[in-house]
């Protein structure tokens, strides 16, 4: 790795002969400075000084086609921290590994929900929700889905991701037989 340029928010690195812009990922509402994530879903470990592979999980769609997704384990070490429903818990003196989907890490880092309305919501509507309806915004932020436009869960490039409602996500999946 060759560090080309670095400022407070973005880091440009030369990885495998390509200049790749990276940022510290936002996971579970916090910025993690031990990793960097690119727009294409590559994750760099600052402590190991290398790209990390992540864990590949497999599932089957309705047509028995194998669908592979990539997850990364991150270390969480805050006092009295509780997870977001996954059952992970941190108590004093222990560190827990949490798993985060690569597509969620890319979207939350490069296209934060606050600045990028979900598909089907206009900017004008989104500004009203953010400003005047915090309970609606919180509900949306907890229930919104991230969809892979090309239906390939291993393709975590920002250009292949979009936020959709659970209803739209289920409709699209049924329509495509996934």
Give a label for each model feature:
Residues 2-145, 152-178:
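Conserved recognition-core residues within compact binding domains
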């Amino acid at each position: 790795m060759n560090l080309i340029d670095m400022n407070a928010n973005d880091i440009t690195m030369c990885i495998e002969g390509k200049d790749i812009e990276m940022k510290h990922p936002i996971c579970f509402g916090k910025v993690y400075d031990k990793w960097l994530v690119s727009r294409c879903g590559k994750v760099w470990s600052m402590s190991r000084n290398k790209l990390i592979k992540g864990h590949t999980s497999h599932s089957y769609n309705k047509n028995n086609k194998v669908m592979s997704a990539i997850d990364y384990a991150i270390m969480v070490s805050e006092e009295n921290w509780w997870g977001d429903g996954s059952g992970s818990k941190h108590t004093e003196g222990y560190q827990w590994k949490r798993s985060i989907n690569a597509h969620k890490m890319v979207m939350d880092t490069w296209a934060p929900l606050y600045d990028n309305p979900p598909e089907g919501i206009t900017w004008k509507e989104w500004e009203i929700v953010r400003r005047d309806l915090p309970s609606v915004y919180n509900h949306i932020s907890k229930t919104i889905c991230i969809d892979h436009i090309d239906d390939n869960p291993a393709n975590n490039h920002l250009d292949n991701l979009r936020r959709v409602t659970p209803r739209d996500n289920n409709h699209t999946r049924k329509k495509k037989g996934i």
